[in-house]
UniProtKB/Swiss-Prot annotation:
Gene: Atg12
Complexes and interactors: Forms a conjugate with ATG5. Part of the minor complex composed of 4 sets of ATG12-ATG5 and ATG16L1 (400 kDa); this complex interacts with ATG3 leading to disruption of ATG7 interaction and promotion of ATG8-like proteins lipidation. Forms an 800-kDa complex composed of ATG12-ATG5 and ATG16L2. Interacts with DHX58/RIG-1, IFIH1/MDA5 and MAVS/IPS-1 in monomeric form as well as in ATG12-ATG5 conjugate. The interaction with MAVS is further enhanced upon vesicular stomatitis virus (VSV) infection.
Organism: Rattus norvegicus
One annotated GO biological process: negative regulation of type I interferon production
Primary site of residence: cytoplasm
Signal peptide location: none
Topological relation to the membrane, as annotated: Peripheral membrane protein
Family assignment from sequence similarity: Belongs to the ATG12 family.
Annotated segments matching region Disordered: 24-54
Entry domain remark: Shares weak sequence similarity with ubiquitin family, but contains an 'ubiquitin superfold' and the C-terminal Gly is required for isopeptide linkage.
Protein's UniProt name: Ubiquitin-like protein ATG12
Crosslink site: Glycyl lysine isopeptide (Gly-Lys) (interchain with K-? in acceptor protein): 141
InterPro entries assigned to the protein according to its UniProt record, in alphabetical order: Atg12, Ubiquitin-like_domsf
Keywords on record: Acetylation, Autophagy, Cytoplasm, Immunity, Innate immunity, Isopeptide bond, Membrane, Ubl conjugation pathway
Compartments it resides in: Cytoplasm; Preautophagosomal structure membrane
Length: 141
């Protein structure tokens, strides 16, 4: 199956905003152009000098009997919280209100719902992306 390179998904913004007022834009990897290889990069970092990357790449992997998302790599704003990701995944997978969803970083721990994705990326990101596992039942610590 071919995926639509222009696919963009939207979900409600930060929890403080009223429902429907603003939308979070998540786009698959194919909708984000890669920077040219001629861009100067500081030693030890993956970001151009003097410019902070506004979105980070997140790789979402299903665990257990949880449905698999066809698009696994997403670009998300650094300021988004883990709870916003949980809400997005629940909506994307069309989970019932009674079904739980757990998020794990690197198959080891569940981050706090108010934790910002950018902070997780800085601490646990590797190869230019943050790997998050999602499941409907508790899997790790």
């Amino acid at each position: 199956m071919a995926e639509d390179p222009e696919a963009v998904l939207q979900l409600p913004a930060a929890p403080a905003a009223a429902a429907g007022e603003s939308l979070l834009e998540l786009s698959p990897e194919t909708a984000i152009p890669e920077p040219p290889s001629s861009v100067a990069v500081s030693p030890g970092t993956e970001e151009p000098p003097g410019d902070t990357k506004k979105k980070i790449d997140i790789l979402l992997k299903a665990v257990g009997d949880t449905p698999i998302m066809k698009t696994k790599k997403w670009a998300v704003e650094r300021t988004r919280t883990v709870q916003a990701l949980i809400d997005f995944i629940r909506k994307f997978l069309r989970l019932l209100a009674s079904e739980q969803l757990f998020i794990y970083v690197n198959q080891s721990f569940a981050p706090s719902p108010d934790q910002e994705v950018g902070t997780l990326y800085e601490c646990f990101g590797s190869d230019g992306k943050l790997v998050l596992h999602y499941c409907k039942s508790q899997a790790w610590g």
